[in-house]
């Protein structure tokens, strides 16, 4: 009888890292634990890991990336390799950076009066998030399609004839809106979640769809691409008509013809204001998914001042400065992120106009003809909105310093 081969003893697990006061919160899928134990990959390539540490939103890890808990590996993976066509428009954002707003505007521009959203035919069904629903679902949608994604740029399928619209928003208002989003959506099981915990998770990139800062960094090199339109969320609120006109000109075809018609342009702008979008909010998501029916929560900017402490504000400022020094985004939100709100004055208006002129050089598109412009009535920003990849922590994806060096040419 052949003697049994003795079992090889299991190697001792790497001890949980010791974190000091002020360190990012350590979840089972934080980079600290991931690097030490490979927790997120123990279930094998076909399995996802759902987890919810005490006090945190419920989330899932798929291939080392953090997603909402209802996401499936097959859908995320097929979305990364799906095919886009020349009539497709892809709305790409970090969560709470104008996603629903842009879907609504773009659908009107492309489909005209054929676009209707309502209960049973919500916008999230007509214009699905590709990583949530998967390629097979999106393939069954009749073109022209308006598709939504929160993918980092390195995850998204890239086709030269497809139009991509990427909208950015200052991180403090994004964080504030995302906090309410996580409390409102039932899937996160976080209706009573706390602000301090959420801010820690946002600052350390441990939320569904990942790190805000890395997300923006991944898309910045596309700032000059012919088939990518960059929009600033705050600029859209300050001059919505001009934003709609730019989107129409970028899309071309029927969309361009619609914005060149003053009556149609006016109609689309009126349909896309905060007050208009707050009406009949069942158009956006099935109400059964929400604790509160109001998906469009609040307009205006600097709502973050109602939540942040000065220390928390300085913390986000420091992260932003470290990530974006030397890039075109370095001064994008100088006033929106400032702790002290700049008083309204002729001097400040002049300074803002100078910065807007510099911004126009980067966000280059034909400006709206003067006869169609509305008067500026506010300096405030507002918006709507609804990945950090744990695997992106390797040197090829998360080396912000090298990315910043590559991007510095765009600022010249």
Swiss-Prot record:
Catalytic EC class: transferase
Matches recorded under InterPro entries: P-loop_NTPase (IPR027417), Sulfotransferase_dom (IPR000863)
One annotated GO molecular function: aryl sulfotransferase activity
GO cellular component terms listed in the entry, alphabetical order: cytoplasm; cytosol; membrane
Localization in the cell: Cytoplasm, Cytosol; Membrane
Active site feature: 150
UniProt note on tissues of expression: Expressed in ASJ amphid sensory neurons.
Keywords assigned by UniProt, alphabetized: Cytoplasm, Membrane, Transferase
UniProt membrane topology term: Peripheral membrane protein
Residue span of region Disordered: 1-20, 393-412
pH-related activity note: Optimum pH is 6.4-6.8 with 4-hydroxyphenylacetamide as substrate.
Documented EC number(s): 2.8.2.1
Thermal dependence, as annotated: Optimum temperature is 25 degrees Celsius with 4-hydroxyphenylacetamide as substrate.
Low complexity: bias regions: 393-402
Bias (Polar residues) ranges: 403-412
Binding residues annotated for 3'-phosphoadenylyl sulfate, in chain numbering: 96-101, 169, 177, 233, 272-277, 297-299
Pfam families in UniProt: Sulfotransfer_1 (PF00685)
Gene3D superfamilies named among the record's database cross-references: P-loop containing nucleotide triphosphate hydrolases
Cited function: Sulfotransferase that utilizes 3'-phospho-5'-adenylyl sulfate (PAPS) as sulfonate donor to catalyze the sulfonation of xenobiotics that contain phenol functional groups. Acts in ASJ sensory neurons to modulate developmental arrest, perhaps by modifying endocrine signaling via the orphan nuclear receptor nhr-1.
Family to which the UniProt record says this protein belongs: Belongs to the sulfotransferase 1 family.
Annotated protein name in UniProt: Sulfotransferase ssu-1
